[in-house]
Amino acid sequence: MHTPLSEEIAQTTARLVVEEGLEWGPAKRRALRQMGLPARTPLPDNDQVEEAVREYIQLFCADTQPRELRALRQLALVWMDRMVAFRPHLAGAVWHGTATRLSDIYLQLFCDDPKSAEIALIDHHVDYEPRTVTGFHGESVEALSLGSKSPELNEMIGVHLLIYDLDDLRGALKPDSKGRTPRGDITAVRRLLQETTTP
């Protein structure tokens, strides 16, 4: 339920997401602290936060964000091409169009053998850090995190390769609560890049 308080929390969260590159969960919790609210205060849902992020970008970042988003999508495509054998799908802010230069890239890989993506990185002498993250069904998922230089932005960007079982691909493309595809394959990302032009 959208209340004036939840809208204010969402707006503060949006500022933290856009200006500091925080993930939504930590940004919501920090917003509560900054606003002096109790930790048990009901948080806005992700749809409300996404709406606030889009509004914040339109108001404060309209001149820079489209170019930054395009650069992140181009870098995502580079890694999707490198990891094409693992059926990569782009997800998160870079896919949904709310990313800025502070956003990381999240690629979901769907593998027959979960270790095969890690072996591919080792074979190509890519430094990465393995860790465990929460997957799209709330389960624990192995992630391979690395830094990659964006030539357009001239800075290092975090790239996270989330390793899923091949069987997970079937349910991965179900529309979200707004009817949107929650992730896109190489063809979809190429199409996004063709549809958008740098101002």
Q: Language model features by range: what are they?
A:
Residues 3-21, 28-101, 111-199:
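Catalytic core of pol beta-like nucleotidyltransferases
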